[in-house]
Amino acid sequence: MTDNVLKLSRKNIKKLIPYQSARRIGGEHGNILLNANESPVSIFFKLKKKPFNRYPECQPSKLISSYAHYVNLSCNQILATRGADEGIELLIKAFCEPGKDAIIYCPPTYDMYRINATIAGVEIKEIPTIKNTWQLDLLNIKLNLSRVKLIYICNPNNPTGNIFFKKDLIFLLNITLGQALVVIDEAYIEFSPEESMTNYLKDYPNLVVLRTLSKAFALAGIRCGFTLAKKEIIQTLSKVISPYPISIPVSDIAIRSLEKDYVQLMKNRVLDSNNNRIWLINQLKNITCVETVFESNANYVLVKFSMFEKVFETLWNKGIILRNQNEKTNLKKCIRISMGTRSESLRLIKELKIFSKKNMCQGEMSEK
C-alpha cells in the first residue's frame, strides 16, 4: 500500500534530496553548536496578553511599519514572511513558469535557491563563483541569461563569508533590466551593513532584497523575514503568500526587537561577533591542522583543514558541532564555523591544538 502511495508523488520530488538543516543533521547532539550561524546568545521577551482565537493580519501593519522605519523604506515596499526562506519560495512561485523559465544560482552558496526551484519544476542554471576569490563569474552569467527570471545572490555569501563587489551587482542589475529580477539575500548584512543594496531599490525596479531576524537579531526560533522591493513586486508576491503567514506571538516579538533599544543591543552583539571573528581567524591561522582560513564578513568563518574528516569527527565527539562543507562546489576539505561566545571559541581552539599535537605527525601530513 505504501508503495502505491509513493507512486503518486511527483517525479522531481522522488529524486529530491531535502535541505540538510543544522537540526536535521546535528539534532540535539553537542553542547557547543557552531553549525547554523545562529546567535550564541538569546534574548527574551514577555508576550503581551492577547486573544488567540482570531486569525492575525496577513501583513501585520505595526510590524511592517517598524521594519520600514528600520530599513528607511516605504511600507508598500515590504512583505513580511516566515524567514527569508519563504521569500525565496514566493519569488519562484510568482515569477517562474515551470518547464519554461529558469533561475541562476552561484555555488558554493545557500542551497535553498536550488531546492525551491527543483520543487517548483523550474530549470536551474548553475554558474559557480570563481574559485578561491568566490566572486561572481559575470561573463558566464551574461552568456546564460536566456529564459532566466531570477538570479539569486547571497551577500555576504553563505558559506564562504565574502562580500561580492558592488560594481558587479550593479552590472548584473543593468544587464537584466526588463528581463530578470536580481535577488540579493542579505540574511547576514547586519555584520557588514555598509554593503547593503537597499539604497539601490529606488534606482532598479528589478532589484529584490531578502532580510531576516534570524541572525543578528538572535531570533532564529520565531521564523520572521522580509522581502524588500518595488511596490509592484510586493503586490505580486502578496497574491501567492499564504493568508496568515505571521502569527500574533511572532509579530509581537519582532516588533519589540525593532524598537530603538533592542536595535542598539543587536548592534552591540554584532560588534562582539565581529571582534570574536577577527580573534578566531588569527587563532586558527596558527593551528597546524589548518590549511587556509578564508576572510569573512559575516558571523561564520570557512576553514580548509588537513585531515578534515578526522577533525570534524573528533570535535563532534567532544560536543563541538560544526558544518561540513566538503561536498559543496569547490569546497573540498572545508568546514564552516559559526561564531559562538568567546568561551566557546576558546574551547574550539583548545581542542584543535590538542588534535594537531596528537595527529599532525610527519606521516599524516601527506593528506595536505
UniProtKB/Swiss-Prot annotation:
**Pathway where this protein functions:** Amino-acid biosynthesis; L-histidine biosynthesis; L-histidine from 5-phospho-alpha-D-ribose 1-diphosphate: step 7/9
Q: Which CDD domains match?
A: AAT_like
Is Transferase one of the keywords UniProt gives this record? yes
Keywords, ordered alphabetically: Amino-acid biosynthesis, Aminotransferase, Histidine biosynthesis, Pyridoxal phosphate, Transferase
Q: Which domain of life is it from?
A: Bacteria
Q: Which cofactor does it need?
A: pyridoxal 5'-phosphate
Q: Which residues cross the membrane?
A: none
One of the GO BP terms on file:
L-histidine biosynthetic process
Q: Which GO terms describe its molecular function?
A: histidinol-phosphate transaminase activity; pyridoxal phosphate binding
Q: Does the keyword Cytoplasm apply?
A: no
Which residues are recorded as modified (N6-(pyridoxal phosphate)lysine)?
K215
**Catalyzed chemical reaction(s):** L-histidinol phosphate + 2-oxoglutarate = 3-(imidazol-4-yl)-2-oxopropyl phosphate + L-glutamate
Q: Which PROSITE patterns match?
A: AA_TRANSFER_CLASS_2
Write the Enzyme Commission number(s) for this entry: 2.6.1.9
Instruction: One Pfam family, please name it.
Output: Aminotran_1_2
Q: Which family does it belong to?
A: Belongs to the class-II pyridoxal-phosphate-dependent aminotransferase family. Histidinol-phosphate aminotransferase subfamily.
Subunit record text? Homodimer.
Protein name in the entry: Histidinol-phosphate aminotransferase
What is the source species? Answer: Buchnera aphidicola subsp. Acyrthosiphon pisum (strain APS) (Acyrthosiphon pisum symbiotic bacterium)
